[in-house]
Structures are given as C-alpha cells and as structure tokens.
C-alpha cells in the first residue's frame, strides 16, 4: 500500500524509489510543516520513572540521521509511506486508532514493530511538505536548524513534550534564549 498525504510534493518515481528496498515499512524523508521543520523520524525511548515508580515508553525525534541511507527507525510519519500488505494482514484492527496523543502513523508503526516487522526511512528520498508560502524540505530544515538550536530545541522537547513546546511561550522563549533558560524552566 502506498499512502501519500495531499500536502506532500514528491518525485514521479516515488513508488519505485521506496519499493526497491523490499522492506516491511518504508517512508520517504519528510519534515514538519511548521518550524523548526524537524525530520519526521522517531526512536522509542524506554525507561523507569523513579518518582512514579513505573516504566515508561515514549517516542523521541531523531534529529541527527544518516543522509542518503536506508535507516531503521521505530516510527515514521506517513506523509509518504509504502507498507507491505503482509504487515497490514498481521496487525489486528483498528490499524490507526490512538488516544495517547500520538498520530495514527506512530500507532501503526508501534503495532508493526510489536508484530515483528521493521520500519525504515529512506533518507535519500526527500519529499517536500507544502507550507504557505513555500515547500518545506531538507534545505529549509538545515537552514533553520543550526546544531546549537537543534540541541536546545530537542532538550526543550524532552522536558516539555512536542505539543507543549509548540504552544508554550515559556518553552519557546527558553529555546530562543539558550540552554540555561531551559534548565531553569525545567526545575
């Protein structure tokens, strides 16, 4: 199954580019529409919360990724994804339902991984994401995201969560003003 969002710009040979890998799930590399235009790649992070005394699992952005490679990840955005039908047949419906605050793409990838399938991103196949007035791609992401800004932003995301950083003016100010502010706000 090839799924492509209606706000993506992709090459005419997108199917061939993804199909050549012959893997369970593979997505073209896309970036978020809104700044900071992060790559839509995720790694699952698991740990133990000593205060709540329970295990936790969450998806974290993969900010630094190998370029021009087929990269195994834990989840991808479904802006442009090719899924082998054996994956769909192996997963129990509902395929894309979640109440955890994550999107249907992450939910599906978690189910696929739990069923023993692998998820990949083809970072050599970069697609554009329509955003008024431009198309967001790797070039815009790299212009916007110098290494220090990415490190600060990623730290804020880890402390506040993606949704909170996008909507929380304190978190936004922390990212703009530097790492000391992020640390102060986190206390």
Model-derived segments and spans:
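Short beta-strand-to-loop acidic/aromatic patch adjacent to the donor-nucleotide binding site
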Residues: 1-9
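Amphipathic coiled-coil/heptad-repeat helices and related helical stalk/stem segments
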Residues: 10-11, 105
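Conserved catalytic core of nucleotide-sugar-dependent glycosyltransferases
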Residues: 11-97
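C-terminal catalytic/acceptor-binding lobe
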Residues: 85-86, 90-187
């Amino acid at each position: 199954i090839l799924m492509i969002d209606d706000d993506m710009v992709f090459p005419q040979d997108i199917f061939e580019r993804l199909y050549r890998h012959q893997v369970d799930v593979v997505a073209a590399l896309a970036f978020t529409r809104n700044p900071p235009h992060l790559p839509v790649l995720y790694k699952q992070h698991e740990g133990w919360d000593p205060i709540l005394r329970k295990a936790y699992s969450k998806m974290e952005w993969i900010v630094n990724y190998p370029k021009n490679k087929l990269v195994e990840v834990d989840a991808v955005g479904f802006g442009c994804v090719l899924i082998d039908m054996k994956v769909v047949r192996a997963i129990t419906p509902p395929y894309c339902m979640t109440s955890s605050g994550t999107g249907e793409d992450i939910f599906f990838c978690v189910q696929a991984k739990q069923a023993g399938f692998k998820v990949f991103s083809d970072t050599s196949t970069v697609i554009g994401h329509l955003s008024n007035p431009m198309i967001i791609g790797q070039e815009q992401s790299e212009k916007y995201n110098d290494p220090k800004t990415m490190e600060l932003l990623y730290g804020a995301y880890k402390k506040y969560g993606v949704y909170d950083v996008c909507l929380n003016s304190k978190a936004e100010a922390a990212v703009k003003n530097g790492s000391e502010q992020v640390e102060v706000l986190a206390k």
